Amino acid sequence: MLAALAAASEPPAHVARWRAQVDWEAAQAETVALLSAYLQVDTRNPPGMEEVGASFLGARLDAEGIPWALLPHSEGRASLVARLNATNPTAGPLCLVSHLDVVGWEDERWPADRGPLSGAIVEGSIWGRGALDMKGMGALELQTMILLKRLQVPLSRDVVLLALADEEVANVGAREAVDRYWDQIGCSHAINEGGLGVKDAIFDGESVHGVSVAEKGILWVELIATGRAGHGSTPYPGEAPDRLRDAMVAIDRMRARPVFDETMLDLLDAIGRTHGGATGAVLRSPFLVRTLARKKLMNEPATRAILTDTIHLTGVYGAVAPNVVPSEARAMYDCRLRPGTTPGAMLERLREATAHVDGVRFEVISAAESSASPTDDPLFRALVRYAVEGRPAAAAGPLLSVGYTDSMDLRRKGVRAYGYVPFEVTAEDAETMHGHGERVPVSEVGSGLERLFSVVVDVAAAP
């Protein structure tokens, strides 16, 4: 309901006033060129070496007279912070967050004329690793800072640009920003990655924009089985591979219970209002969602992952040769935990499920609890409003992200962090994140810039 009310509300007058002063065609062209060049900077992680990416952004900031600083954490690796100051601040600083690093790739899987470091503009899209995750957002945020500075928009709160290192591997950049450099950041609110707009997400001709207000916790574990070693020609009881198999079967039989919380129900309500009719009425009714729509939602992998704690087998290890029985065999699990489930509670469930199998134990690789920010906040309402402004076939609402981002560390400081990349793309384009042929439509660079600029002016500019 909150999302629907936010989407229906009119933008403040000062937003329209400042938007009218922007040449949006020129701003899109400038941002497209910026993103194309940014994608050509190699910051794949590992090894990272994000300082070259930070310096690239810093050169653009220098050209506009916006002060910035490196936040180093190891040789060749650094984050960047820049700031536009409010004259008489009436609210805490707003932070525009992105990460400098990108995941690796397989060169042979990309088209020859639009490779991962090309920044090529082909078939109406900008191609390159990071176009969606998340150099595209970084380019929008930098261009928003540039527009604020050029137009001399009077600010009611500081606006901070924070481009972080090492999001894709260990989140060291975010942790160090919070633990070592917070005096240079000190924000109360943040816009980061998380949700985005997807065309035809549920119904043909209708798009859904999820604004992430929470992220699932994690428990990464290894299941380790030990037992008798020997020759493959003669099976014996108590061998490690057999014990591992039995424990894995027990884990596979664990049943997840769906949770229809306020976040999911509010998003479904927004989708239902947009779609209308009998189906829309079902989506707007919590009772009908739990009864009539439950089966369909649980059968879709994407919504099932939101509704439940997930236990995902991601690897099995131990074999030496076909005729050798190893004394140890391992399986790796990625567990993603809804708010309300702690890593300790999930670990206990795993132990209980496998208690009947001798010679098995769990080792924790990494663990973190879920984190969340409230929907009753002006920044969340602004993100929802401009995601769908002027487009009756678009719905926006809160989202529980199944992955985790640097927002998890920001929330440790009490920051209200929301995840929304203001692009609207096809499901096919969205699936290129971390995949082959990552790209973003040129038109969405312009639309996304206007959405983000509108949000920032709404919540950070003096009326």
Residue ranges and their predicted role:
Residues 1-8:
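Hydrophobic h-region of N-terminal signal peptides that target proteins for export
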Residues 10-131, 148-157:
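Acidic/His- and Gly-rich active-site-bordering loop/insert found
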Residues 28, 110-111, 153-154, 212-218, ...:
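Short glycine/proline-enriched loop/turn "hinge" motifs that connect secondary-structure elements
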Residues 89-91, 105, 198-199, 257-320, ...:
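An extended, acidic, His-containing surface patch that forms the Zn2+-binding/catalytic region
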Residues 176, 180, 228, 233-257:
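A short core secondary-structure module
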